[in-house]
Amino acid sequence: MNPREEYDRGYHHLTQMFQEELRTHFHDPDGTVFYKGLKRMIDTYRIDLRNLRFFQVNLPSKHIADLVMEECASLGIPLDTLYTSMSKMGYCGPPMVFICLDAILREEKLHDKDLILSFVSEVSKFMQAGYAMRYYEQV
């Protein structure tokens, strides 16, 4: 079926994988699709993680974020860089990327060349997205 027609009719919600199917397809022996997608982004764009200040994981619960953080540590991402606002405001889906970025810019003291990294896997369709943003102090 045409993807636009599938979307317009709402069929994309009917074909999502849930529970055990999701676990089977999300976790591979060599890492989760999240880990592999993030690694591909870091490698493709040669993202230097040395000044990583915040890593914003856009997933619906902290325990899922904690699971992928264990894998991410092998990429050189320190566990203490995880940034989340879920405990304060819950999870509202894709807009969390911008809500967290706004919170970082308003509430945190950033230093010259601090790196903010964000990544998400939309697990029911395995779409992935991310950004890397470097902060520069004004001169």
Model-found features: residue ranges?
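Conserved beta-strand-centric core segments of catalytic alpha/beta enzyme folds
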Residues: M1, F98-V139
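Hydrophobic pocket-lining "lid/loop/helix" segments that shape and contact the acyl-thioester
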Residues: M1-S85, E137-V139
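N-terminal start-of-chain detector that recognizes signal peptides
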Residues: F26-P29, K88-Y91, I104-R106
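Well-ordered alpha-helical segments embedded in enzymatic catalytic cores
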Residues: V33, G37, M96, C100-A103
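Gly/Ser/Thr-rich loops at beta-strand to alpha-helix junctions
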Residues: N58-H63, G90, P94, E122-F126
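Cysteine-centered functional microenvironments
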Residues: L82-M96, F119
